[in-house]
Amino acid sequence: MSQLDTTTPSGDYLMALDAGTGSVRAVIFDLNGNQIAAGQAEWLHLPVPDVPGSMEFDLTTNWQLTCQCIRQALHLAKLPASAIRAVAACSMREGIVLYDRSGTPIWACANVDARASREVSELKELHNNGFELEVYQCSGQTLALSAMPRLLWLAHYRPDIYRQAGTLTMISDWLANMLSGELAVDPSNAGTTGMLDLVTRNWQPNLLEMAGLRADILSPVKETGTLLGHVTAKAAQECGLLAGTPVVMGGGDVQLGCLGLGVVHAGQTAVLGGTFWQQVVNLPQPIIDPNMNTRINPHVIPGMVQAESISFFTGLTMRWFRDAFCAEEKLLAQRLGIDTYSLLEDMAARVPAGAYGVMPIFSDVMRFKSWYHAAPSFINLSLDPEKCNKATLFRALEENAAIVSACNLAQIAEFSGVKASSVVFAGGGAKGKLWSQILADVTGVPVKVPVVKEATALGCAIAAGVGVGLYEALDKTGERLVRWEREYIPNTEHKALYQAAKTNWQAVYTDQLGLVDCGLTTSLWKAPCL
């Protein structure tokens, strides 16, 4: 839990509920976008015995944790519940919740649930192996992470739940439902089910019918920033908010994060550096990738979509390197009172650009249709300790993350015609000054780093404010509230060097994938059914 700023000229505040993969937060903002206080709690997803890949979302415990966070945030902010003018919720995408016909939640799974591999394969075979292409052309999604295979799994193995189901929503919508009693989804999050039309921003029931699934479980669609309902007396008693507080439609975490970063116009580009890295490009109208390498999601801005590529485990790889190899640096950083990553960046800054040719093999470029990665490794190491050491490997990892991002952005530009003129870099990775400069050098465009690097909750609060008329519009408010810390200008000499390094890495990575294909090494990650 944290308390950041308790000074505001206004008596009006907004609350965002942010349901991530590993934790939930309740965050209070003033109307100038300053974070006042936050309550946070970790949560775990539940594997079902004898169901490989299952990760169920604990509805009872997680609502209790959410209520705990709301009360913590109010306490830390020293605010009465009456000061909260509106609340909205955002969440990890792909996670779904089912309700019975009376509106009671009965089953949910997290975004990481991978139980439905067999069902993915079964659905891919429909229409002479053309069903996945039909899904992608309509929704911008493939089957690997979509809701239909999970629903089919329930029909096969939990027909009791499947028969009871009356409505489906996303996890952000479940939070809004627990507060207000109302059921609806927004396009940005529901779009990741693979059942929503990118053009109409509404459900496409015929996709479920083609899959042999029920199409009568689709809830109403309401745009982000639309008033959904009000906090019920029951919810108020449980969570500490005032009964009657407006509850506004939120959305998907990445899209609301882009709103909080002011990435709201066609052509704008962001790299969000967390556990996964997302490369996001706003497109002027729905366009799909003919090679199915890139997912296309509805933005929270009506009429706009986002091309999104994902680099796998980028932040996790850095944490692994720090914890596995940098015990001395962790102790030194502790004594100096600085972050270990800052110390490692200082060391890596003394290594020449190109990291002496060391090539990390971790995440591949995104290939949404056939999504898997090579086995983790370092290639082209030297036995010269002056050239090949922890500083070199750390710099190589930062350079590689930037190279994969640049490759993903190039893929998007190839099919969409939208090429980044600058990049907004946010998330934990953007705290690294060297990393930000490397990203500018590799992409060849200026990189802007915001003051608020974790902007998802801010975007969610903006939606809450728009829903009750405190802000004029989502896009204008996102632009107005974002503040910039620094801009990094690309080094043209480094750009040429990194272009050659990118070409070499792509060739080596292709060979490494071949080792996985032969069963000689183990993939970093594979999509269900591959």
From Swiss-Prot:
Gene Ontology cellular component annotations, sorted alphabetically: cytoplasm
Subcellular location field: Cytoplasm
Gene Ontology molecular functions: autoinducer-2 kinase activity
Keyword Cytoplasm (UniProt): yes
Gene3D superfamilies, A to Z: 3.30.420.40
Record-level GO BP terms: carbohydrate metabolic process; quorum sensing
EC number: 2.7.1.189
Enzyme class at the top of the EC tree: transferase
Keywords for this protein: Cytoplasm, Kinase, Transferase
Main location: cytoplasm
Superkingdom as given in the UniProt entry: Bacteria
A Pfam entry, by short name: FGGY_N
InterPro entries assigned: AI-2_kinase (IPR033676), ATPase_NBD (IPR043129), Carb_kinase_FGGY (IPR000577), FGGY_C (IPR018485), FGGY_Carb_Kinase (IPR050406), FGGY_N (IPR018484)
Cross-referenced SUPFAM superfamilies: Actin-like ATPase domain
Catalytic activity: (S)-4,5-dihydroxypentane-2,3-dione + ATP = (2S)-2-hydroxy-3,4-dioxopentyl phosphate + ADP + H(+)
Family: Belongs to the FGGY kinase family.
Function (record text): Catalyzes the phosphorylation of autoinducer-2 (AI-2) to phospho-AI-2, which subsequently inactivates the transcriptional regulator LsrR and leads to the transcription of the lsr operon. Phosphorylates the ring-open form of (S)-4,5-dihydroxypentane-2,3-dione (DPD), which is the precursor to all AI-2 signaling molecules, at the C5 position.
Name this polypeptide is given: Autoinducer-2 kinase
Source organism of this protein record: Yersinia pestis
Gene, per the UniProt record: lsrK
